Amino acid sequence: MKTTIYDVAKAAGVSITTVSRVINNTGRISDKTRQKVMNVMNEMAYTPNVHAAALTGKRTNMIALVAPDISNPFYGELAKSIEERADELGFQMLICSTDYDPKKETKYFSVLKQKKVDGIIFATGIESHDSMSALEEIASEQIPIAMISQDKPLLPMDIVVIDDVRGGYEAAKHLLSLGHTNIACIIGDGSTTGEKNRIKGFRQAMEEAGVPIDESLIIQTRFSLESGKEEAGKLLDRNAPTAIFAFNDVLACAAIQAARIRGIKVPDDLSIIGFDNTILAEMAAPPLTTVAQPIKEMGAERHRTAGRSNRGKRKAKQKIVLPPELVVRHSTSPLNT
């Protein structure tokens, strides 16, 4: 049978209230008694029931990360950064991967509201009406919420993003500096603020250089290797550009694979630049030039804002914008004339 709080209290020779105070770190308890109870809990492999804590309105010491695709190294590395910091602060972390599915997103929001987690971090676009409504309900419950890598100005949450406009601008400027003007963009569905801002920065750099943009070279696809490879292949078969700006490293690697299948050499025949600077960028062949997002800093900033919010020192929403950085490797080179 599973060990209960009653079993722990009996074995430690204390009241159930005392065990509860040790678990929740509340009330006045001597160090000797606290250590005795903790030793018994360890010996009996007792795990506090977080669901019961949620029902009584107590802290569950759990936070949740809602991400669109945890198999994408960007979100995997982001989750690792947040989890490490959460562990230092005494929190456990739940990870909800929505697979870009609004129905899954809404379902997770409902579950997290019921569990009364102590905070929720969103790394999804939250575009559907149902998701927005569910999120507004969570906000009304006074659950601390924050958003990373996305921006929803009308929602009452802390936001940690990078300067996506600058990132798109730097990517285009790099390719232009190498002599490329026939540049394609491989994006997602274009609905998120991050995508919109990256294309805004890209357009700004092209306009400053006096280079017209071929709208047929702005390709939409799902943020997956398979979809990216398919759409990049169609692009290369139809009207091969001399350079591609992919909106994440997964799509950039997909473009490299599509080029290799067609005997197009990267970077001799085709320059490719990605976005994120995940482990994929280093492992790609050739190693990928990319715009780096400061993933660790994004996770750390999220916890700093959450700490201020949970301590009641700040009620106003805070937006933190971090700078991107161009990382030049071997997937881009001067235009081969």
Curated annotation (Swiss-Prot):
GO biological process terms on file: regulation of DNA-templated transcription
Domain of life of the organism encoding this protein: Bacteria
Matches recorded under Pfam families: LacI, Peripla_BP_3
DNA-binding region range list: 5-24
InterPro entries in the record: HTH_LacI, LacI/GalR-like_sensor, Lambda_DNA-bd_dom_sf, Peripla_BP_I
CDD domains: HTH_LacI, PBP1_DegA_Like
GO MF entries: DNA-binding transcription factor activity; transcription cis-regulatory region binding
Entry keyword annotation includes Repressor: yes
Keywords in alphabetical order: Activator, DNA-binding, Repressor, Transcription, Transcription regulation
Residue stretches making up the HTH lacI-type domain: 1-57
PANTHER family: HTH-TYPE TRANSCRIPTIONAL REGULATOR DEGA, LACI-RELATED TRANSCRIPTIONAL REPRESSOR
Official protein name in the record: HTH-type transcriptional regulator DegA
Natural source organism: Bacillus subtilis (strain 168)
Lineage of the organism: Bacteria, Bacillati, Bacillota, Bacilli, Bacillales
Gene name of the encoded protein: degA
